[in-house]
Amino acid sequence: MERKIVLVDDHSLFRNGLRGLLERCAGCRVVGEAASGEEFLAMLPGLEADVVFMDFAMPGLDGAQTTERALARRPDLRIITLSM
C-alpha cells in the first residue's frame, strides 16, 4: 500500500532533505509540500494524503495550531510533528 505524504515546514532545505529520504522508501510518495500552516490549510480541501510531516515551530500558525485546524476538517489524517 502506498502512503501519500505531505511535508509542512518553513525551511525549504529541511523539506528537500526529508523528501529525498522519503522518496527512497518503498511505498512512500510525497504528494505535496507547504511552507506554512496557512498554505497547508489552503491546500487541504482537495488534498489526497495519508500522512503529514509537520514542523512544530513555524511563523504564523505553528504546528499545534495547524494540526488542530487540520484535524477538525480531516480527522482521518495522521500528523507527525517534527522540530529541529
Provide a role label for each language-model segment.
Residues 2-14, 18-22, 52:
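Conserved acidic segment of CheY-like receiver
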Residues 26-27, 49, 75:
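Proline-centered flexible-loop/turn and helix-kink motifs
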Residues 27-35, 43:
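Short hydrophobic/Thr-rich beta-strand motif most characteristic of the beta2 strand and flanking loop
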Residues 36-39, 61-65:
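Acidic catalytic/metal-coordinating carboxylates
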Residues 47-53:
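Active-site beta3 strand of CheY-like receiver
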Residues 55, 83:
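Active-site residues of response regulator receiver
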Residues 58:
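Receiver (REC) domain active-site loop signature in two-component systems and cognate sites
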Residues 64-76:
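Short amphipathic alpha-helix used as the core "switch/output" element in two-component signaling
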